[in-house]
Amino acid sequence: MRKKIGVVVSGRGSNLQSIIDHIAEGRLEVEVAVVVSDHKDAFALERAAKAGIPTAVVERKGCKDKEEFEDKMDEALRNAGAELVVLAGFMRILTGHFISRWEHKIVNIHPALLPSFKGLDAQGQAVDYGVKIAGCTVHFVDEGTDTGPIILQKAVPVLDDDTEETLAARILKEEHKALPEAIQLWAEGRLSIKGRKVYIAR
């Protein structure tokens, strides 16, 4: 019996596609139970439909407050039987109202080597700062912004002529490897959390 994940998106869904592809290739042993989007026109919804994955749209503008929005998201995920919430290009910050219900059961992919360059425009921050190594981080989500315990990281070089766009493209290739890898570790029951550290059973 495969474990079920819910993938939460806002945009084009390239990390969702990577998850779908890894499952199809037999490299990721989970079922995507639902894809939840906060935008009805997100291309990620088309990717999900093409793969035969149920979808749900929960838009903030249709809710009286953030709590109602998060309640509806929670309902969509639980109704689908999701056991892990995967944020794959979800462009909103979740509050403790939602996170407390899914403690250590939400993972996020961030396009920087945390704790450096948190928040928006991480790739641009890296280029502007002049770092020589950048990358991506998969982490559990806590109530801070990109502060949760780190599961794994992938590094890429920053070239002298890099722009935000060229660096972002190089990092994205690693994101497409890192996120399915982290989900598979979870599915195999190999992740444990002690304080800030995530331990991976060998």
List each language-model region with its residue ranges:
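N-terminal glycine-rich "phosphate-gripper" loop used for MgATP/nucleotide binding
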Residues: S37-D38, K61-G62, K66-E67, A80-G96
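Donor/substrate-binding cores of folate-linked one-carbon enzymes
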Residues: H22, A88-K197
